[in-house]
A protein has these predicted regions:
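N-terminal alpha/beta PP-like core and its mobile active-site loop of ThDP/TPP-dependent enzymes
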Residues: 1-139
Length: 139
């Protein structure tokens, strides 16, 4: 597809396969390969929003208005925490949001350094599923 990171290409292909045609994207370094892929994919229309909390509610509003699942892509660390209010609203309104966060390599998590908090499960219990994609390997 578009990225040198195979897991990003697989993610993009799966989003398209399962009916994602719109994505709200926020700037960041950790999610930049994902944002680039989404925004160059001819099957996905991207809507950039700078503030993650606002982006969450923009995505929720789009899901309500269009009655379709919307992807929301943010960077690592506290950016994911900022979408928690919209994630909770979407969960209780039964509106499909696919929330994607770019994260640091696993060995960098929980190192008492800024923006290295645990991402997996951060939005639970207000999401139906939380998954972590495997990191790409050079094998």
């Amino acid at each position: 597809m578009y990225s040198s990171k195979e897991n990003v290409n697989i993610l993009t292909a799966l989003l398209v396969k399962f009916g994602i045609s719109k994505a709200v994207v926020c700037p960041g370094s950790r999610n930049s390969p994902i944002v680039h892929n989404l925004c160059t994919c001819p099957d996905i229309e991207c809507f950039p929003v700078t503030d993650e909390r606002s982006a969450g509610f923009v995505a929720l509003g789009m899901s309500l208005a269009d009655n379709e699942p919307i992807a929301l892509c943010v960077t690592s660390g506290s950016a994911l925490l900022n979408v928690a209010p919209a994630a909770a609203e979407a969960f209780y309104q039964k509106r499909p949001l696919v929330i994607i966060s770019g994260d640091r390599p696993a060995q960098w998590i929980n190192q008492q350094d800024g923006q290295t908090l645990q991402q997996h499960g951060t939005l639970e219990p207000n999401v139906r599923k939380s998954v972590t994609l495997p990191e790409p390997h050079n094998e």
